[in-house]
């Protein structure tokens, strides 16, 4: 057997190192890909099974669930315009792209590993080709069950359940304090002025309604109960607002809304709740939502408003 000269040995060793490095790189890449595609099975309320990332890192949210993902420390890369306009989300959505279901190409460029939205969107089939897509029917679940369901989708069910339990306990405690301050029989109305139309709300249409009526057990006026409880909301003309206002009014107003001149109208000033200084004005952009982050904020708002010394 011939002995290898130094040059041949050196060349073979070099080739071996290169091959070894390539092999190590390939193994590393395979491990990275394996970690990146690790999935768990999410089962929808209709029984459909969807493979979703075990630890989603690039989520596009096309509906009002961004606050839950922020609260559960899940990274968002794309979000709907309504959520982007919520000042309470600004820190959690810093640098996040604003998209809609129509922006298929833009969403593709974001390279999401999970898409969450409502089932009334267009392009759902195209979106599901980009990433696992989970769509919900608005109002199909109770507002707290919806939060837990979002937790399941992003593999944060334990965190979601713990939040719900703590929130309910706190809301009920604060509710008892509020009843003690305003009286067991006091009535509360939630109203909002939007696009030259006034709306009153039932007990499950965001804007703090779930907290006031479901968790705290506060009373709504009979006129609100008759018209808005089942439907969720009821549109009225501004001038008849007084017919629906209880002892207290939660008025949701957009900070930039040019249609708030009614606040200076005589008919508004003559409403008893207004005359008694029992109107609490909330920023509509923070009240449109009923995700966990927004509910925490709304609960604090009610505690400070009703129990202010």
How would you label these PLM feature ranges?
Residues 2-9, 20-61, 159-191, 254-259, ...:
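Bacterial Sec-exported substrate-binding components of ABC uptake systems
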Residues 49-52, 56, 133-136, 149-164, ...:
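Second-shell loop/turn segments in exported
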Residues 104, 111-116, 132, 241, ...:
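Proline-aspartate-enriched helix->loop->beta-strand connector
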Residues 124-161, 183, 263-281:
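Charged, glycine-enriched surface loops/patches
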């Amino acid at each position: 057997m011939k002995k290898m000269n130094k040059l041949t040995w050196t060349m073979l060793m070099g080739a071996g190192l290169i091959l070894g490095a390539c092999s190590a790189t390939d193994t590393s890449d395979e491990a990275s890909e394996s970690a990146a595609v690790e999935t768990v099975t999410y089962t929808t309320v209709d029984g459909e099974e969807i493979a979703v990332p075990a630890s989603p890192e690039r989520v596009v949210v096309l509906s009002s669930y961004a606050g839950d993902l922020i609260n559960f420390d899940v990274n968002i890369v794309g979000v709907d315009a309504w959520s982007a306009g919520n000042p309470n989300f600004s820190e959690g959505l810093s640098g996040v792209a604003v998209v809609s279901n129509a922006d298929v190409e833009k969403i593709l460029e974001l390279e999401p590993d999970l898409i969450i939205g409502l089932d009334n969107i267009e392009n759902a089939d195209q979106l599901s080709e980009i990433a696992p897509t989970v769509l919900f029917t608005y109002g199909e679940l109770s507002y707290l069950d919806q939060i837990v369901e979002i937790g399941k989708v992003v593999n944060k069910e334990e965190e979601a359940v713990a939040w719900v339990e703590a929130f309910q306990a706190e809301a009920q405690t604060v509710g008892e304090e509020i009843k003690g301050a305003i009286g067991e029989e006091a009535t509360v109305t939630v109203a909002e002025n939007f696009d030259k139309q006034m709306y009153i709300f039932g007990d499950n249409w965001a804007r703090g309604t779930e907290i006031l009526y479901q968790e705290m057990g506060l009373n709504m006026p009979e006129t609100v109960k008759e018209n808005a409880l089942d439907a969720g909301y009821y549109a009225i003309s501004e001038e008849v607002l007084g017919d629906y206002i209880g002892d207290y009014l939660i008025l949701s107003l957009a900070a930039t809304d040019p249609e708030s001149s009614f606040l200076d109208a005589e008919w508004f000033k003559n409403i008893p709740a207004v005359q008694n200084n029992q109107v609490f004005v909330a920023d509509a952009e923070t009240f449109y939502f009923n995700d966990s982050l927004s509910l925490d904020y709304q609960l604090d708002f009610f505690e400070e408003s009703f129990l202010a010394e």
